[in-house]
Amino acid sequence: MRVVAFAPALSAAEQNGGGVNAKGFPMTSCFVDNFPAQITVPMVIALCALGGADYDPVKYIVATSPEGERVGSLEFSWHWHDNPPTPVKFRVFTQYLPMRVSAAGVYSIGLYDSLHQADTEYLYPLPVLKTNPLLANR
């Protein structure tokens, strides 16, 4: 299985006919009114695989604070049928990651095969900042 895209969006929704409708993708920063805050981050994940494999994948999205503390996670899985006669299959998801942000900083959001996996090549840095009230009406 190969990850084609993994990033947050300002908003994202799966379409009935397949695909995702996303705005603000990729999201390059997140603003909150106050700390601490509980936020939900729409994540877009696109994958492909060869037919004949990866029928019931399970993935985990984990958010960590700038200090490395886990501040949110979710598990998602699906049954992935082959698409004959095409030798490859594609899937795109929108997952909504709940996370607690306690202070401004760069949070990390990673895609993992297990909740206990230490490292991943799919890691997205997300700066979380406090909203500047002087710029709120711009």
Question: Across the structure, where does each feature detected by a protein language model lie?
Answer:
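Contiguous segments within soluble domain cores/interaction surfaces
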Residues: 2-104, 108-138
